[in-house]
A protein has these predicted regions:
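N-terminal cap/leader regions of alpha/beta-hydrolase-fold enzymes
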Residues: 105, 166-170
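Helix N-cap / beta->alpha transition motif
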Residues: 40, 150-159
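Catalytic cores of nucleic-acid endonucleases
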Residues: 112-153
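Structural motif
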Residues: 104-106, 135
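A short acidic, often aromatic-flanked loop/helix-cap motif at beta-alpha or helix-coil junctions
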Residues: 144-146, 157-167
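Accessory nucleic acid-recognition modules appended to NTPase machines
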Residues: 1-102
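Short catalytic-loop micro-motif centered on adjacent basic/acidic residues
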Residues: 86, 107-110
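Conserved small/polar residues in nucleotide/adenosyl-binding loops
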Residues: 172-174
Length: 174
């Protein structure tokens, strides 16, 4: 019940696991498996060890920003109205996020280091004939780049993903 309270209070963002990255994602949602992100990445940074904030402002490069970046992406996706999930499979690995985008499952990976092109789980899912996934996005510390089915984008671009809805049908009465 504590997790539900945190969600209802607007403090936390639950991201549920899906058993397969196929639309509709809701049908394969595992209600007992989820990750919990903070609704404000500033809260996460404040909870870290003393002095980390100064090290971040000083642009020290020996800090693992993975959890901060992943939290920031989760926050942006939720703010833009996406139902956010993640995928975890023993054989294929874990995808940080999966959303429905333009009627398809879109895997999203968040990478904070220089090895942003290494993503075993993402490669497995893209190569799987079972999932029919066309594209994926990797948010990283680099410039925009496209390699095959993967779009590499700077972390801040997570804020530019927009949920598109089907336009409403307008009935004309004669």
């Amino acid at each position: 019940h504590s997790f539900i309270w945190l969600k209802e209070a607007g403090v936390a963002l639950p991201v549920y696991c899906v058993q397969e990255p196929q639309v509709p994602l809701l049908l394969s949602k595992a209600t007992n498996l989820f990750k919990l992100f903070l609704s404000d990445v500033g809260l996460l940074a404040a909870m870290y060890a003393d002095g980390l904030q100064i090290r971040i402002l000083n642009k020290e490069n020996n800090i693992n920003f993975g959890s901060v970046y992943e939290n920031a992406v989760a926050q942006e996706l939720c703010a833009h109205g996406f139902e956010v999930y993640y995928f975890n499979n023993k054989k294929q690995g874990e995808l940080d996020f999966v959303i429905e985008f333009e009627g398809e499952a879109l895997p999203l990976e968040v990478k904070s280091g220089k090895d942003y092109t290494k993503h075993r789980a993402l490669n497995h899912v893209l190569e799987s004939p079972n999932y029919h996934i066309q594209n994926a996005i990797v948010f990283c510390n680099e410039n925009i780049e496209v390699k095959d089915q993967i779009f590499y984008c700077p972390i801040y671009m997570a804020g530019f993903l927009e949920k598109r809805t089907v336009p409403e049908l307008s009935l004309i009465h004669i």
